[in-house]
Swiss-Prot record:
Belongs to the HisA/HisF family. Keywords: Amino-acid biosynthesis, Cytoplasm, Histidine biosynthesis, Isomerase. The active site is at D8 (proton acceptor), D129 (proton donor). Pathway: Amino-acid biosynthesis; L-histidine biosynthesis; L-histidine from 5-phospho-alpha-D-ribose 1-diphosphate: step 4/9. This is 1-(5-phosphoribosyl)-5-[(5-phosphoribosylamino)methylideneamino] imidazole-4-carboxamide isomerase.
C-alpha cells in the first residue's frame, strides 16, 4: 500500500486542521520546502500536498512553493485545493506535478472533470470529502445531499482511476480511520482508493493495508511522532 505523507499549505506554511476547521489551525512547520525534503529523506515515495488557500479561493494560490517542494523532494507529488478549470490542471501537470486532485468541482462541474479525465487519465484523482456519509464541498464549508458511495460510482463511470476519500469527522483527530466506510467503498467501486482522515498509528496503516486499499494519507500522526517514517516504509513494503 502506498503511503502519502501530507503537507497542507496555508499562508506559505505547513499547517494541520482539526476536522477541516480553518479556525483550528496549527502550524507544524514554517518551511514547507524543508518539510517536503525531510519526508523524502525519511523514505517517503510519494507526497500529498493540499493548497488550503486555493481550496478557499477556488484557484491555485501556492503554485510556486509547491514547485519548489517537488524539486526539493525529488519524489512524485499529488496536489489538490482549488483546482476548478482545465487550464489550472494543465498548469500543474505541465509544471511537473504528477497527479492533480479535483475536489468540489467533480460534483459541481462534471463537464470539467470529464474533460480532465479524457485528457490526462491516471494523472487525475478525485477527492471525495464526506461528513456522515454526505459529500462536502467548498473547502468543507458546505455539505450536499449526495451520498459518498453514489458519487464514487459516478466517478468510476466517468473513468476516474483514483479516489481519495476523507471522512471529515476523523480528519486531524487521531481517532483512527473509518474502516467501515473504506470497506464499503472498496466493495462498491473497482478503482484505486486512498484513505484520508484519522490515521493515528502504525496499526491504523496496517488495518487499511489489510483492506486491500491502494493508499493511505498520514498527516498529524507523522508530525506529532505517533507514526515514524520507518513505520511508513515498513508498512508500505509489507504484503498484508
Amino acid at each position: 500500500m502506498q503511503i502519502f505523507p501530507a503537507i497542507d499549505l496555508k499562508n506559505g506554511q505547513c499547517v494541520r486542521l482539526f476536522q477541516g476547521d480553518f479556525s483550528k489551525k496549527m502550524i507544524v512547520n514554517e518551511d514547507p520546502i524543508a518539510q517536503a525534503k525531510a519526508f523524502a529523506t525519511g523514505g517517503a515515495t510519494y507526497l500529498h500536498i493540499v493548497d488550503l488557500d486555493g481550496a478557499l479561493e477556488g484557484r491555485p494560490v501556492n503554485l510556486e512553493i509547491i514547485q519548489k517542494m517537488k524539486e526539493a523532494a525529488t519524489v512524485p507529488v499529488q496536489v489538490g485545493g482549488g483546482i476548478r478549470s482545465l487550464a489550472q490542471v494543465d498548469y500543474y501537470l505541465d509544471s511537473g506535478i504528477d497527479r492533480v486532485i479535483i475536489g468540489s468541482a467533480a460534483l459541481t462541474n462534471p463537464d470539467f472533470l470529464h474533460a480532465a479525465v479524457q485528457k490526462y487519465g491516471p494523472k487525475i484523482a478525485v477527492g471525495i470529502d464526506a461528513k456522515n456519509g454526505y459529500v462536502a464541498t467548498s473547502g468543507w464549508l458546505e455539505v450536499s445531499q449526495v451520498n459518498y458511495l453514489d458519487l464514487a460510482k459516478q466517478m468510476e463511470k466517468v473513468g476516474v482511476e483514483t479516489i481519495i476519500y476523507t471522512d471529515i469527522s476523523r480528519d486531524g483527530t487521531l481517532t483512527g480511520p473509518n474502516l467501515e466506510q473504506m470497506a464499503a467503498l472498496q466493495k462498491h467501486v473497482n478503482i484505486h482508493l486512498i484513505a484520508s482522515g484519522g490515521v493515528s498509528s502504525r496499526a491504523d496503516l496496517e488495518a487499511l493495508s489489510q483492506l486491500g486499499l491502494y493508499g493511505a494519507i498520514a498527516g498529524k500522526a507523522l508530525y506529532n511522532g505517533h507514526i515514524s517514517m520507518s513505520d511508513v516504509t515498513e508498512v508500505e513494503n509489507h504484503a498484508y
